[in-house]
Amino acid sequence: RQVIDVNLELTDGDVPHLPWVDSHLTDPYRPLLLTDRIEAHGVTIVRMSPANLSPRTLLETWLRLLAVAVAQPDVTGWRAAVVTRSANPEILVAPDAQQARNILAGLVRVAWWSSQQLFPMPARTAAALTEVILPYRPNRWVTAAQAGWTEDHDSNWSPFVSADYSDLERLCRQHCDTSPLDLARWLMTPITTARTRGRRSR
């Protein structure tokens, strides 16, 4: 067992095109500092969850995996195992250090931007749109996107958008000049790739 100290200065990164970045944010591309202490067993990060795999747990584990891959670029083979009530753990395999840095820097930068401007892509909705994790659907007339957005929508979202998924689509078009699906793909496609690598490594 080891504890990895993460102390990273992140610049640039893979970010979606958002029309308000240059006009509404002050110094949006300044370097960002990420610090953490992450426990690993060899080259594996283990995350335990008593419930089924959730999009938030998957995303948090992915961020930790990227962070250690960047913090220790000379070590290869980093992976994460999410152990849930399912029979098999969910395995994610990290990309190479440079690609991991690019993805991580983009995620951290968008998280920082979203503290100043609305970024309308919560985890459950993104996972539903990309079919990474499908939400519970009460009946066949409710789409996966609507079911995911219903789970995400709360009092924090209410001032900006209703619980109707079509309103989220409208907000994305008006505020971000893009679609929810495009934002979801930006967030989730690298995770899908890491899951595919994990299944091949079993």
Q: Model-flagged regions — what are they?
A:
Residues 1-202:
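A positional "C-terminalness" feature that preferentially activates on distal terminal regions of long
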